[in-house]
Each structure stands twice: as C-alpha cells, then as structure tokens.
C-alpha cells in the first residue's frame, strides 16, 4: 500500500489545499472560460474511460492489487489502447480538475498523484507478469502503460 499516502495527500491538496493557506490558494492558471470548459469535457471523458475500463474488467476488478480465481488477461476494449485505462481516466480527470481550479495546490498535488499511480501500476504489472509471463510480456510490447503510443 506504498501508493496510498501520495494519492491521499494529493487528493487532499486538490480537494482542500486551496483553502489551507494563501500560497496554495494562489491561482496560477488564469480563469479562461474556454479552458474551464475544456477541463470539464476532459473530466467527463476521463470518467467515461474509467467506467468503460471498469466494465471491461468485469469480475477481474479489485480496488487492491490482487489476482482473483480464474483471473483472465484483458487486452480488448480500452485495454487495447493502454494497459492501465482506469489510471489513464483518473489522471485525465485530475489534470482536468487542475485546469479548472488553477490553484497551486492542484499543481503541487499532481506529481504526488502521478507517483502514487505509477507505484501501484508497477506493482500490478509485476503480478501480471508472474501470472501471465509470456502473454503479458507480449502485451507490454504492443501497448503503452497509460498514454497511448507514448508512455
């Protein structure tokens, strides 16, 4: 659960950090209506991607890193685009929220959330390689982790 602390701190900063002190409350991304609406659309897209990925996983889904009995390697739907689409959706929603709010607190929280997700996905990948050594290694060669064609 090493990934829990950074995401909790990052989530707290995003949710409440701009209320904690003047430096965290400083708006560094100017409020531009088009940018705010872009953030809203990105947030909705990230949420939709998370939901699609969650339903695609079906019974394989778990909130903690574990394999279930009869666990299958899912490589279709959003998993054909990225290996960790739920994290892609969450990061998209997080970045969108930072764009809309524009406060230092969100910008400080962003790397914490990214590090937390990165730690967790590395742990998941280790487990998947142990369970599906050949299949997952081939999947890793074909599909990027969280940003299609890039990362």
Report each predicted region and the residues it spans:
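Membrane-anchoring alpha-helices and their flanking helix-loop junctions
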Residues: 1-69, 75, 92-151
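Solvent-exposed interhelical
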Residues: 71-82, 86-87
């Amino acid at each position: 659960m090493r990934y829990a602390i950074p995401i909790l701190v990052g989530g707290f900063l995003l949710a409440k950090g701009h209320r904690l002190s003047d430096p965290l409350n400083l708006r560094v991304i100017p409020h531009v209506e088009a940018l705010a609406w872009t953030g809203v659309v990105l947030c909705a897209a990230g949420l939709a991607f998370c939901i699609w990925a969650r339903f695609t996983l079906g019974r394989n889904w778990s909130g903690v890193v574990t394999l279930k009995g009869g666990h299958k390697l899912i490589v279709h739907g959003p998993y054909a685009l990225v290996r960790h689409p739920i994290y892609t959706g969450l990061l998209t929603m997080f970045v969108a929220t930072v764009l809309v709010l524009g406060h230092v607190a969100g910008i400080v929280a962003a790397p914490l959330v990214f590090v937390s997700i990165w730690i967790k996905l590395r742990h998941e990948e280790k487990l998947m390689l142990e369970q599906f050594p050949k299949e997952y290694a081939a999947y890793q060669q074909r599909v990027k982790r969280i940003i299609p064609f890039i990362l």
